[in-house]
Amino acid sequence: MSWSSALIKDISKPENLIISSEIAVVIADKFPKAQHHYLVLPLADIPSIFHLNRSHLSLLEELHLLARNVVEVKGVRWQDFNVGFHAEPSMQRLHLHVISKDFVSTSLKTKKHWNSFNTELFVPYTKLYAQLEKENSISRLPKSLKDELLAKPLICNQCEFVARNLPSLKGHLVGHLQDPKSVCQRVRLGNQFFPTAGYRTSELAYCFDFVDFYEYKKQMEVDKLAYIRDELQRKLNDKRNFLIESDRAVVMKADYPKSQYHFRVVAKEEFRDITQLTEAQLPLLDHMMDLANQIIEKQKHLESRNFLIGFKVNTFWNRLNLHVISNDFYSMAMKRISHWNSFNTELFMPFQIAYMMLSVQGSIESISEETYNNLQEKTPLRCNQCEFVTNMLLDLKAHLYQHWQRKEDERDQKKKVDKIIQMISETKLDEAEAKPKLLNEEEPIQAQPVAAIAQYPNEHLGKPLTPQQQPGKQQAQNVYDKNINGPSVNMMNQNNPNNPFRNTPHLNRQSQKPPHPRSGPRGPMAPWTGPRFPCHQQQNRFRPPGFNACRQPYPPYHSGHQQFPNASSVGGGQTGLPGQGQGPRPKWNSNKIFNQQNRQNTVQAQPQAQNQQTNQQQIQNSNKNQTPKKKPWKNRLQPVGKVQNQGGANRDPAPPSNSKPS
């Protein structure tokens, strides 16, 4: 890569970037020709200004905005900079120069360096922007004109001094940097350590000059303070800082908020503070108050009584601004006693008092400097929310944190309550929409319980239940009457094929009694729960699990799976007709059901055992003449009657053991 492509390499390194955006970046010049020299480069591959057209005007605006940002970041004045492009650039990639006017640098070594920034070879940003907007292109300078401009004499950019050579010019520029006033006046005063007689003015300009650096430092501090005071004026030129904008004022956030919520309503008219207002500016105050109420309404779960709205009597900024600040004063920027006193003493004038004084008196008088200094350092510090008093700001901030934490808990609780109320209102709205419209001659249909709707989602409102659905409805009502606070587990997620909500997510609550494990020869079997209505109904077409020859025999005390947990469908249970009074569904009692099943299975197993013994004797007589073979494993099981379920008594006897299973 050649030296002309060095800029492309520099912007690819993150450590070189001062400011970056999605469109352009800012870097420092490797060979600065002044104390401040920065380059603003676009990320798009644009070789030079000769490749620009009207479509790049927005790009130029972005480059100019970044140039202003880097000047503000460095804390220097914008008017002390030259911003523009080289008419004959030597480096590839379009770049905007942001260079200070002092030109005091060791990298300023040749006459070409000076003339490239202080002649027509340097095209200001505004001039290039206007030419591009008018002509849609930038043309090159003729070579003869370029050579003529490079050969121009070295003329100071801050006065009419003409230097014989570059060293004399650099010495003259150092004098301008040390004292912003005229250098010629300082030369006439002379120097007590260096004789000036016999020397020309141009030769004395670059001599060492022992000036009063204390006065210079003091002047620089004053200039810096004035620059900071104009911060609000600069923010008015950048619309990205605006939260709310109108034709007379804007709302923006405070750079160093003294509370959790701190906004400024800045007037666009040039008034320094409230002492310059008269009765004619009352409509302006009304408009600023309206904007303050708008920004307060945008803060959720925070009422207007928690805000202070007013002006500072002796403001720091050179622009009229109305403070809108929450009264918690919980902020890291609250660092000094003067910060607290500026909002909690007579230094802060509420909006109502300022408005009344302008209405009655027509003006507001400023306070004296002595009174202002005394109020700034006033002690003890009193809490604005209780009677707490202390002399240390750190103790006050710790106390204010407790108030803030309590209010935050109340706001969180209020948010939760509002959310619950909103959910309830939405549920009521959905029920109102689902309710059918009443005809003129029809009576209103009584609303059905939620449990019935959940169990029978396909049931239309107003349609009577079938005899098969009535027991299930009555059973569901009895269950939910006992479980007022809800079931112990999510009953809507039980693996019942008749349950339309069986695929819904679980409530992450475990059952108090886990289900009995069902293991088979090929792994665990899927759990089975029978329907909740009586057996032998047309809706129950699910095949119950029958005999499995590959399954290991059950223990003698076990009779098989329980098919119908409903007490009405177990042997001997009464099945009432729809509409008859039925008792509530009995609770599960493992010992009672187990003993009942054993008694039923013992009665049913006796005739089955007699039939099986007869079948086995016939099989043995038919196989006497055959060669004896080892019986297969499945024929060496216990009698079939011990593993059949409750419905085995109604089936045909089992086939002989030497026949193939169906």
UniProtKB/Swiss-Prot annotation:
Subcellular location: Nucleus
A GO biological-process term: mRNA splicing, via spliceosome
Listed EC numbers: 3.-.-.-
InterPro entries associated with the record: Histidine_triad_CS, HIT-like, HIT-like_sf, Znf-C2HE, Znf_C2H2_type
Pfam families given in the database record: DcpS_C, zf-C2HE
GO molecular function: damaged DNA binding; DNA 5'-adenosine monophosphate hydrolase activity; double-stranded RNA binding; mismatched DNA binding; single-strand break-containing DNA binding; single-stranded DNA binding; zinc ion binding
SMART domains, per database record: ZnF_C2H2 (SM00355)
Single GO cellular component term: nucleus
Residue ranges with Pro residues bias: 653-662
Biased composition (Polar residues): 501-513, 560-569, 588-599
Annotated region described as Disordered, given as residue ranges: 482-662
Top-level lineage group: Eukaryota
Span of the signal peptide: none
Role description: DNA-binding protein involved in single-strand DNA break repair, double-strand DNA break repair and base excision repair. Resolves abortive DNA ligation intermediates formed either at base excision sites, or when DNA ligases attempt to repair non-ligatable breaks induced by reactive oxygen species. Catalyzes the release of adenylate groups covalently linked to 5'-phosphate termini, resulting in the production of 5'-phosphate termini that can be efficiently rejoined.
Protein name: Aprataxin-like protein
